[in-house]
């Protein structure tokens, strides 16, 4: 007897419907075809144990299993459930009439319990596109899958519940989530706020400019000056995620298996802060079965690299291409996968190996050569992709002792959103450009060209401060954002002057002059 059930294979962000065909005829052999990996081939043992534990026997006949399309590699244990159901139906132990109406995924434990799988959300999207009546998933995956409208999603605890449901012996209600309500309720629930930060007004301003224009930023300052504290509060002033951005971001986390059983849509921009010992594969993605790395988990959010020079130089260099292209391709011998990685890069670092170069309250023991060597751990091409370079001074006692709260994140966020709306209107007809940080050279000349007085000041600053040539475009991009925050149609002298102040590391004499001179 021939029976079909349906599942899905996830490769990168792409999902393909998999048809599982089971044929049982007299005999004793078990045959598997369909390019499955080791976990798929081992499913026979898991299924046999799960069935026996629940009163069924694995078919003792000539059994042929095929997973189509045969040229598509199938990976993981998510095919256990649909294969087990097809085996039972083909062996005439259950009525399999309804199998064709549902897509199924789930790993079977030896006792028949359903274990969570990766990629339930993109699988649900595929099931809806293929016009299945519903999707059956492990209970732990039901909330993330249920965000897909116009699809019945059933979360099951074990294989016996699935059998009862498919055969019509027991009624189950599909999981229902008010996606929009949950999304908007959680959108502004931030635990951290800039009102908690004492002093550091110049750094807050730099972070506001970075948020308004989508600019990458690096903070340089001694230990304890508040670099990490400031960075962790940046999501609270960023424009909120749109539903489309949230769905895309949640899919990536679903594929990576990073969603909890209580998760539905991710409602706030991701903030990822990998340790400096992270490997290249963990940062950009990879592995035997390529999975998203930290840069993709930070998609539509922030990637924060604390103590940047402590990262492996080779690991840092692999960031250059994703920062430019906003997508990462991971290639293997017979296939490749692609993950989006449109993130805002925020970094922090000490000014020298001992950490106290230029600190008025501590003595630095580093030589200029040691400082320069420390700074050279960050390559020019990587630094070229960071628009704002902000120095942080230790907070004076008079600021620490203040009892009045600082400006709240909500107030700053209003200004950021207003500036972003100006940019969205400006670039509405340009594909792939949404904020000032993404402007091309041609667009810089079109939208950020300074007036005559500003050009002269910029020329003078580049000569006097030994600014590098690559700083020119970055200054104009940042100046355009500052003008947007001011509601100014033209880039004017004050905007250029402030933007010049954000290019500290481009100064040729950085290691020789004092940091705060």
Label for each model-derived stretch:
Residues 1-218, 222-228, 331, 471-472, ...:
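Peripheral, non-AAA+ core regions of ATP-driven protein-machinery
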Residues 26, 58-61, 98-99, 131, ...:
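Short loop/turn elements that form and flank the Walker-type P-loop nucleotide-binding site
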Residues 33-44, 59, 66-76, 290, ...:
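Basic, amphipathic alpha-helical bundle interface domains used for macromolecular binding and assembly
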Residues 170-209, 213, 240-295:
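P-loop NTPase nucleotide-binding/switch module
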Residues 219-260, 325:
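Walker A/P-loop
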Residues 221, 285, 307:
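The Walker A (P-loop) glycine that initiates the GxxxxGKT/S ATP-binding motif of P-loop NTPases
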Residues 300, 306-307, 318:
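Walker B catalytic acidic pair
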